[in-house]
Amino acid sequence: EAGYATPLPVQLGGQPHVIVSSGRAYSAVKVADGQEAWNLRWFTRYGVNAADAIVDGDQVFVGSGYRKGCGLYKIGAELTEVWKNKNLSTQMNAAVKIGDHLYGFDGDSGGPGKLRCVSWKTGEVVWEHATGFGALTAADDRLIVLTGTGALMTAPATPKGFKPSGRTRVLDKDCWTAPVLANGLLYCRNSKGHLVCLDLRRGQ
């Protein structure tokens, strides 16, 4: 059964694996022989497990939309739940982990989404900002945020709050794809397939 998330290459126990999603689960598969190392049953409405898992050391975070929520698990012979709640329902795009915090969008497209900072260790909400639904990436400890209506913002990634340095409309709605930064160029796309490229290189 196919899923929406991109297969994520990771090292688990010193061996290469990929974490893949289906409409019913997230699982880790050994690259060498295709054997499943672990399987986390994760049922989301419409079978939409679209956000990539996040692995840090011996822990894995997963989340999905439609009010399914999120959870952090310790990786071992079996997965052990660390915490699970509905504080970060990442519908289409993964959150990003910087330091001891997750930054991502809670909520579904077309609804009152919020940008949230959530503690990696406890799952508690540290702050939230009423941006509406959107997508984000990060570079140099800064968040690059694209709202669902096409507004682009950047801000320091800090648990002290969301303080964007500016806001610029770069596209029409609906923007569901995370911005991509490569070689000083920032690419943003909307659901109609319109693509913009912004040159962020200084003095060039």
Positions of PLM-derived features:
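Blade-level signature of beta-propeller repeat domains, shared across WD40, Kelch, NHL, RCC1
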Residues: 70, 150, 174-204
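C-terminal hydrophobic structural anchor segments
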Residues: 126-164
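Short loop/turn segments that connect beta-strands within beta-propeller blades
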Residues: 30-34, 74-78, 119-122, 156-160, ...
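Short loop/turn segments immediately following the C-termini of beta-strands
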Residues: 21-23, 65, 107-109, 148, ...
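Extracytoplasmic beta-rich repeat domains
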Residues: 1-15, 39-56, 63-67, 83-97, ...
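Structural motif
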Residues: 28, 67-73, 110-116, 150-155, ...
